[in-house]
Amino acid sequence: MDISAAVFNAARDGKLKLMQKLLINKSPEERAALAEERTEGGTPLLIAARYGHLPVVHFLLERCGANVALGGSVNFDGETIEGAPPLWAASAAGHLPVVKALLEHGAPVNNTTLTNSTPLRAACFDGHLEIVRYLVEHQADLEVANRHGHTCLMISCYKGHREIAQFLLEKGADVNRKSVKGNTALHDCAESGSLEIMKMLLKCDARMERDGYGMTPLLAASVTGHTNIVEFLVHQPRASREQRIHALELLGATFVDKKRDLLGAMRYWRRAMELRWAGGQAGALEKPTAGPLVPAYDCSREVSTAEELEALITDPDDMRMQALLVRERILGPAHPDTSYYIRYRGAVYADSGNFERCIRLWKYALDMQQSNLEPLSPMTASSFLSFAELFSFVLQDRAKGTLAARVSFQDLMGVLSKSVREVERAVAQRERPPEPPQFSKALSIILHLLFLLQKLRCGPEQEHLKRQTVYRLLKLNPRARGGHTPLHMAVDRDTTSVGRYPVGRFPSLAVASLLLECGADVDSRDYDNNTPLHIAAANGCPDIMAALIRAGAHFDATNAAQQTAYQLLEAQSSGRHALHPLNHTTLQCLAARAVTAHRLPYKGLISEQMEAFIELH
């Protein structure tokens, strides 16, 4: 173990004497350098502050000259916080003496993490009231929000820390501040069920605002199922009759899908219906005219009278469809919960073996997501992955003869086409290109869908449609992590891992062959100058290499490390393969390699075509 790791471990474990022994013979400059050396992403001072080792903190600051503001990586509850200053770590962990020591040595009180979280916000998160008081006394800014626009007051409300929320309000925290998504501290109370804090906020003139999804705190409480908040707010004079009706209807839907309490749902739906028809026909607030019937909902219609509502009791499945209809009407298709619970209901059907209902619901949710979310949204990616996992499960069990259900070409092809459309949307959005991890996941899921599609028998028209869709993908020239093309990914073992459950197995000769037949560039290069042939070789796949060579792959092209695919295969398989280099090497290749090996000048002396050929080697 090197000395920097030993110093870090001593700081982490609070072993002051060991640290002194390690550093006693070092010069001041060496001690300062070791105090700022990062191990596992963090400095000795950061890790000592995290675990509250005050003597070690004093030693590092006073004897080693440690930088009191230098941030790093630190772990809390299994999550790595990047760019966390020592003061943030001590505040989050609740170590008041360390907080005092760091501030006495000049730690900036508003120094933030990479996500713009302040030490004050960290203390508010975990309910450390004394630290909150101390930081505010030392000029901590109450209004510095994190990258999501979430303030100290908001997180105190969400976590239910009443005394901290009260203290912040007394110190003048903005009660109506909005986050990036438009939610206020009242929304956080509603989502967490913090009724007493909500009452405090309302006494401080908090306003019932709508967030970016059009949600009021009342609706937010209905979505999360906090009946105490709903009951309090529906009796407030500021809630209109229509708002009360919507809140009770939505709470009923939450009882169906989240709490799985159908009788409880009926109680709230009855109350909503009574409110709708209060005052008789003349004063009724009827539901809006229903749109077209939705096959995914089994063509169910929302009930509009008390008689129709009571008839639901005999049909639990119809009640579940009512919950989906109610949620879509009130929240709208853009709200994440609308598509989430449609997918949830589909998953319940799948668990009971009703795959047809599941697929219908999931397709409807996917269309909703693609119409309302950004391209390659994590929610949409999750939907595509769920389809791939479901199709894989059905195909495997059908092959074993344990399942009567089957996957149709139309279902699988429909999802594949939508997934390629998602990539097309992302590529078209040039001003906001997708993040590489999102793009990589999307391409990986598409390859898994192709893997499954290759297992189905296809007629000529179906084969044409499949190839047409693959061509649409290849035409975009999409690149995953490391510059991998779909062909690189098809011959890479790492593509196998896409979710929690197995789907396809890679490298896949079937998928690679399909991509080649549809025009994939067999000599395309990734960012390390690897061709698909290099990747296949590194994965020990001579059969796939042979297919690539038949498709025109250049056998002895070199990558950035000046390695050929054959050299990678030799290293991977220790010569246990039937691929013979002389069968694929031309005299022209040997000449090009000789020019490269002897560094002979050639640029400007031969044709551009010949120059490009030599550069391959």
Curated annotation (Swiss-Prot):
GO terms for cellular component: Cul2-RING ubiquitin ligase complex; mitochondrion; ubiquitin ligase complex. Its main location: mitochondrion. Pathway: Protein modification; protein ubiquitination. One of its GO terms (molecular function) is ubiquitin-like ligase-substrate adaptor activity. Keywords: ANK repeat, Cytoplasm, Mitochondrion, Repeat, TPR repeat, Ubl conjugation pathway. GO terms for biological process: negative regulation of inflammatory response; positive regulation of inflammatory response; proteasome-mediated ubiquitin-dependent protein catabolic process; protein ubiquitination; regulation of ubiquitin-protein transferase activity; ubiquitin-dependent protein catabolic process via the C-end degron rule pathway. The keyword Repeat applies. Substrate-recognition component of a Cul2-RING (CRL2) E3 ubiquitin-protein ligase complex of the DesCEND (destruction via C-end degrons) pathway, which recognizes a C-degron located at the extreme C terminus of target proteins, leading to their ubiquitination and degradation. The C-degron recognized by the DesCEND pathway is usually a motif of less than ten residues and can be present in full-length proteins, truncated proteins or proteolytically cleaved forms. Belongs to the fem-1 family. PANTHER family: ANKYRIN REPEAT CONTAINING, PROTEIN FEM-1 HOMOLOG B. This is Protein fem-1 homolog A.
